[in-house]
Design a protein with these regions (language model features):
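Phosphate- and other anionic-substrate recognition elements at nucleic-acid/protein interfaces
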Residues: 1-189
Length: 189
């Protein structure tokens, strides 16, 4: 097992996006859905079990771990102090689980710095949501189009509209973090 694998994580208390790269090439995307679990310790157990399963099933030994850094300041219309503290607490728990399972000290990357490093420009005036712009960028970055899971909205004003599954955005963010982390490692060696 000589291949070097890197993992990227977009951690939140509801969905965790995970990307796996072999050397500097995309390998797979995963997610962990925690939306139906309220207790943080139960969430941590689910995360540990799922990441263990991924590592075992894929038969990989991870050399690098990159995690999207948490918000460090308030922005208008964004998260409250309570939300940021809860996310920071959970991020720490998950980071420790990742360290225990992989033996790798995580490298934290600011999402805006990661996007800048990759040349991702978000068009704030576009009719396309910024999260969908990230998915589109990932699709353009891949040699083959990724088969993103879709759903048909069943009610409300968007009834009948086909949209990405909610976890796709987290997987795309994890891809960006991992790819930027790998480039960062290469540039600094």
């Amino acid at each position: 097992m000589n291949d070097k694998f890197s993992m990227g994580f977009d951690i939140s208390t509801s969905i965790i996006g995970i990307s796996l790269f072999k050397e500097d090439n995309f390998y797979k995307l995963f997610y962990i859905d925690l939306t139906k679990t309220k207790d943080y310790f139960e969430k941590a157990f689910i995360v540990k079990t799922r990441i263990s399963d991924i590592l075992y099933t894929e038969g990989v030994c991870v050399d690098n771990v990159f995690i999207e850094d948490i918000l460090q300041s308030f922005s208008r219309g964004m998260s409250s102090a309570k939300t940021i503290i809860q996310l920071a607490r959970f991020n720490g728990i998950v980071s420790n689980i990742i360290y225990e399972l992989t033996g790798c000290t995580p490298v934290y990357l600011n999402v805006n710095s990661a996007r800048k490093l990759l040349g991702i420009k978000i068009d704030k005036n576009s009719s396309i949501d910024k999260k969908e712009q990230i998915i589109n960028w990932v699709d353009h970055d891949l040699t083959e189009k990724y088969n993103w899971p879709m759903k048909v909205v069943s009610r409300g004003k968007n009834k009948g509209v086909v949209k990405f599954e909610k976890y796709c955005y987290d997987m795309a963010d994890a891809y960006v973090i991992c790819k930027a982390g790998i480039i960062n490692v290469i540039q600094n060696t």
